[in-house]
């Protein structure tokens, strides 16, 4: 049972509304023209006009995404995937790997080229292996610039890896005591759970890479694939996907997790969150209970998430109803915004409403 609420001071409140304000008026992609344009709520991560989420209106920029992932991976064993920002006071940025494919098109005398840019590609692999990996992902989720797949990736970066799950300055009203709890929480998951999947041929996970490139078996070679310790494996060995239990062909890339150990592998399309079953964006995962999780659901499995502001709750004093939780100050009606602590309320499809607003929604 939650304790009696105390008066909360503003505490640590550094989050800038600059991005929200600059997106003011942006139409909602979900409402298809019925929304008058993005109107930021003062503390919910939604539009006041249509109640849809921020990511239904706008997405963070490439630079913001790369800074966010750089911050996530810094101070972890994956910091080699980041680079220091010159004059950035120790800030690190994600060294996102892109892949550009250029194919000539035969059209008359002047040659033309068809160029495809993947906004993200697995690091440390040859272009051939990277392309094989992409072909094993559903086409609508391939992060090709200007396509639905690129939009899907950027949306998942916002949803699976919320900036306010790792950066206290992006949380609203943290008390000093909560700030310390959050800092320890982040430090612990970076040390014990955070991981980045590795793409390799079956049996080659964990092997050293030459100049950052994954080694490939020569065309037509019949040699056995090396094991993780560098010795030659049994050429007749079957490699099985950890999720679907299907066979992984020896010439087809798989995903490895060093948290799981290199005896386990996943088909590229099977490396998904154990909770929501969505592909793990940029292969970033959190290891828990013998499976990879996305950042959002990993954090929620350890601490409650406020159904009002979407931030993790780092206080022991909060409101819980069934499997939902709220900061006490956010236990308010989603319709009229009145405080509902000690008052009648109704929860319908995850929405917290006062009786009056609930009745008006039904009529």
UniProtKB/Swiss-Prot annotation:
PROSITE patterns the UniProt entry points to: LIM_DOMAIN_1, LIM_DOMAIN_2, PET
Residues with the Phosphoserine modification: 16
Biased segments, Basic and acidic residues type: 208-220
Tissue: Highly expressed in both skeletal muscle and cardiac muscle.
Sections of the chain in a coiled coil: none
Record-level Gene Ontology MF annotations: transcription corepressor activity; zinc ion binding
Record GO biological process: positive regulation of calcineurin-NFAT signaling cascade; regulation of cardiac muscle hypertrophy
PET domain sequence ranges: 99-206
Function: Transcriptional cofactor that restricts GATA6 function by inhibiting DNA-binding, resulting in repression of GATA6 transcriptional activation of downstream target genes. Represses GATA6-mediated trans activation of lung- and cardiac tissue-specific promoters. Inhibits DNA-binding by GATA4 and GATA1 to the cTNC promoter. Plays a critical role in the development of cardiac hypertrophy via activation of calcineurin/nuclear factor of activated T-cells signaling pathway.
Subunit: Interacts with beta-dystroglycan. Interacts with GATA1, GATA4 and GATA6.
Record-given protein name: LIM and cysteine-rich domains protein 1
Organism annotation: Sus scrofa
UniProt lineage: Eukaryota, Metazoa, Chordata, Craniata, Vertebrata
Gene name for this UniProt entry: LMCD1
């Amino acid at each position: 049972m939650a304790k009696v609420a105390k008066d909360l001071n503003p505490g640590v409140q550094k989050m800038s509304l600059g991005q929200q304000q600059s997106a003011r008026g942006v139409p909602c992609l979900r409402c298809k023209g019925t929304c008058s344009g993005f109107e930021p709520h003062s503390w919910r991560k939604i539009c006041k006009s249509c109640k849809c989420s921020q990511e239904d209106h706008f997405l963070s920029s490439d630079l913001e995404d790369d800074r966010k992932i750089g911050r996530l991976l810094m101070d972890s064993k994956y910091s080699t995937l980041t680079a220091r920002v010159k004059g950035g006071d120790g800030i690190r940025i994600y060294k996102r790997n892109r892949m550009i494919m250029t194919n000539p098109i035969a059209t008359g005398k002047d040659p033309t080229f068809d160029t495809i840019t993947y906004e993200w590609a697995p690091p440390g692999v040859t272009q051939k292996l990277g392309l094989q990996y992409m072909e094993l992902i559903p086409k609508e989720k391939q992060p090709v610039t200007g396509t639905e797949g690129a939009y899907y990736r950027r949306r998942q970066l916002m949803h699976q890896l919320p900036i306010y799950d790792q950066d206290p300055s992006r949380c609203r009203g943290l008390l000093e005591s909560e700030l310390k709890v959050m800092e320890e929480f982040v430090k612990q998951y970076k040390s014990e759970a955070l991981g980045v999947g590795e793409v390799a041929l079956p049996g080659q996970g964990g092997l050293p890479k030459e100049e950052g490139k994954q080694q490939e078996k020569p065309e037509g070679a019949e040699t056995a694939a090396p094991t993780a310790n560098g010795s030659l494996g049994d050429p007749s060995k079957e490699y099985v996907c950890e999720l679907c239990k299907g066979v992984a062909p020896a010439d087809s890339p798989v995903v490895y997790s060093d948290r799981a150990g290199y005896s386990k592998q996943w088909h590229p399309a099977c490396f998904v969150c154990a909770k929501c079953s969505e592909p793990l964006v940029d292969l970033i995962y959190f290891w828990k209970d013998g499976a990879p999780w996305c950042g959002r659901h990993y954090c929620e499995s350890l601490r409650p998430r406020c159904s009002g502001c979407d931030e993790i709750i780092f206080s022991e004093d909060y409101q819980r109803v069934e499997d939902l939780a709220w900061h006490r100050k956010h236990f308010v009606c989603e319709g009229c915004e009145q405080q509902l602590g000690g008052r009648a309320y109704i929860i319908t499809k995850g929405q917290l409403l006062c009786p009056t607003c609930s009745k008006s929604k039904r009529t």
